[in-house]
Curated annotation (Swiss-Prot):
GO molecular function: ATP binding; ATP hydrolysis activity; GTP binding
Positions with a binding annotation for ATP: 55-60, 249
Function statement: Hydrolyzes ATP, and can also hydrolyze GTP with lower efficiency. Has lower affinity for GTP.
Gene Ontology cellular-component annotations: cytoplasm; mitochondrion
Domain OBG-type G: 46-301
Protein name (record): Obg-like ATPase homolog
TGS domain: residues covered: 322-405
Amino acid sequence: MRGIVTRIVLSTQKCLPSVNCTRRYYSKQKDISIVRQRLGRPGNHLKIGIVGMPNIGKSTLFQILTKTNLGNPANYPFATIDPVHAKAPVLDSQYELLCEIYQPKTRIPAQLTIYDTAGLTRNSSKGEGLGNAFLSNIRSVDALFQLVRAFPEAQVPHVEKSVDPVRDLQIIQEELLLKDAEFLESYLKKEGRSPKTCAKALDTARRALEVVLGKGRQISKAEWNDEQIPILNSLNLLTAKPVVYLVNMDQDDYLSDEQEALKGIKEWVEKNSFGDQVIPLSVLFEEQLFMLTPEEAAQECASLGKNSQLSEIICAGYSALNLIHYFTASEKIVQAWTIADGSKAPDAAGIIHSDFKKKFVAGEVIKFSDFEKYKSVDACKSVGKCKTKGKDYTVEPGDIIFWKIAR
């Protein structure tokens, strides 16, 4: 199967289609689904990092996405050294409707953990600049927002002395490929001498080395079988991580829908990172909206005929990590619970408390489309739209669930 190629829509939420390699196949003999392996660390507490060249707006975008204030980012390379992280709310129409109906005292949306990392430069894989530290930061995250600069600004110098988005994309990809090649060569040298190392692991590592070094391709864009993928996941290779490309455009070009700056970038992504999402934005425009009240920002967007891209960016990152969420709802609290797509009911319940998994009995599940139609739990129950599900149930995006656990 392909590593990370299948595009799917997760739900009726505002989250857009994104890259996901989990596929479900249905057995002809039994009414069960078989979930294929996917590249990436499995889990519910995954994180995404903003990466790119220095001086392209990474730290400013991070502060806007996470609503944090770390001071004005400096206009010189490596202003960010140690990675910082914060959570961004994943707001969607389902969550908003539940809050509108219940008017709860406490509201907790789904959240995406985002890391701001130092700028990557040419020869970082050889240790230049912040080289090794930067690449270690990338290794610690599970997906990438790759920000590329497409705006000219004399007061913000470019480390390569000129603005060329396609060149920057190529530099970053080459550095990540070289670092993966270095890691794989070291792994094969060390583990190849050990009689305890599985032959399949060595064969997979050799093929991965041929992919990144011989073919110059990302691990995520090669084909891998279900035996190879867990091995690759254990290696935590940089080019196995899903990527969402963000293009920081000149504000005037962005507001006027100027496509010239995007053309070369889209062509490069189509050729080198097929299937990955490209989202244009203006960090300067987003920063100006960030300084306004929500009402003022809405008026500004309406007058310009252009909306903020923050929600789309956050949802794209959430989706790239293969995350979904379900809801628990009452007059006291409406909360979205983040889980990995494909999670079974006991695992989803265990996100609330470990006892919910250990003492799992069942879950009463209402599909969001039914709740949206009937507007209350009692109304859904009266028409048979509240179903009792057992431990084999796969939780779906937007499910409203009431768990039953043993005493």
